[in-house]
């Protein structure tokens, strides 16, 4: 069985760029997206749509 660190689709958390709150948990494919993932999502803390970036 493969280790979690070498998993092709690991779980990642997305944090708001503005307030740094970790609002979302998702999966990503490391082969297609080797860099940090950045998505525009709604931040309930800020109350607006903001860029959310993968945090470690």
Swiss-Prot record:
Q: Where on the tree of life does the source sit, at the highest rank?
A: Bacteria
This protein's name? Large ribosomal subunit protein bL33B
**What is a biological process (GO) this protein takes part in?**
translation
**What SUPFAM superfamilies does the database record attribute to this sequence?**
Zn-binding ribosomal proteins
Its gene name is: rpmG2
Listed A to Z, the keywords are: Ribonucleoprotein, Ribosomal protein
Question: Taxonomic lineage per UniProt?
Answer: Bacteria, Bacillati, Actinomycetota, Actinomycetes, Mycobacteriales
Query: What is the originating organism of this protein?
Result: Nocardia farcinica (strain IFM 10152)
Q: In the UniProt record, which is one GO cellular component term?
A: ribonucleoprotein complex
Report whether Hydrolase shows up as a keyword of the record.
no
Q: Which family does it belong to?
A: Belongs to the bacterial ribosomal protein bL33 family.
In the record, what terms sit under GO molecular function? structural constituent of ribosome
PANTHER family tied to this protein? 50S RIBOSOMAL PROTEIN L33, CHLOROPLASTIC, LARGE RIBOSOMAL SUBUNIT PROTEIN BL33C
Extent of the signal sequence: none
């Amino acid at each position: 069985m493969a280790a979690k660190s070498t998993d092709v689709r690991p779980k990642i958390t997305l944090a708001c760029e503005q307030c740094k709150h970790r609002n979302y948990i998702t999966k990503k494919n490391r082969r297609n997206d080797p860099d940090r993932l950045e998505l525009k999502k709604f931040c309930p803390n800020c109350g607006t749509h903001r860029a959310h970036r993968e945090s470690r």
